[in-house]
Design a protein with these regions (language model features):
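Well-structured core secondary-structure elements of compact alpha/beta domains
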Residues: 1-40, 56-71, 101-105
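Cell-wall glycan
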Residues: 6-7, 74-85
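Phosphate-coordinating loops and pocket residues in cytosolic domains that bind phosphorylated ligands
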Residues: 10, 50, 82
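Signal for well-folded cores of large energy- and translation-related assemblies
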Residues: 39, 53, 81-84
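Glycine-centered tight-turn and secondary-structure capping sites
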Residues: 41-46, 86
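Short, well-ordered alpha-helical segments enriched in acidic and aromatic residues
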Residues: 45-54
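Short acidic-hydrophobic surface loop/beta-edge motif
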Residues: 88-94
Length: 105
């Protein structure tokens, strides 16, 4: 199945690789705050990605483009499939960190 999404990756000290000193609980808290700001219109998803994401996709506002679900870790693909197009799902935890996912296709 092909999916299209944008995401914000929030790293934490137990992620692979551990590129941040915060714990997973704080990363989840930051994710919830960002989702709230984005949904209230106070911050665009693209701006939040550029300012907060640990993924190189931040340069594209978090845009991952189209991908086969098998190309992503199972946690990410499963979460993405449960999000309606143009919506943002709840924070998703994977070995890479905490993801904020917006399904775009």
């Amino acid at each position: 199945m092909k999916l299209k999404a944008s995401h914000i990756l929030l790293s934490h000290k137990d992620a692979n690789p551990p590129t941040h000193t915060r714990g997973i609980a704080l990363a989840m808290n930051v994710a919830e705050q960002l989702i709230s700001e984005i949904k209230s219109g106070g911050l665009s998803f693209e701006q939040a990605a550029r300012e907060n994401s640990a993924c190189p996709s931040k340069e594209r506002g978090g845009d991952l483009g189209w991908f086969e679900e098998e190309a992503m870790v199972i946690e990410f693909s499963a979460a993405c499939k449960n999000i309606q197009k143009d919506d943002i799902g709840p924070p998703c935890i994977s070995p890479f960190g905490v993801h904020i996912i917006m399904r775009t296709g």
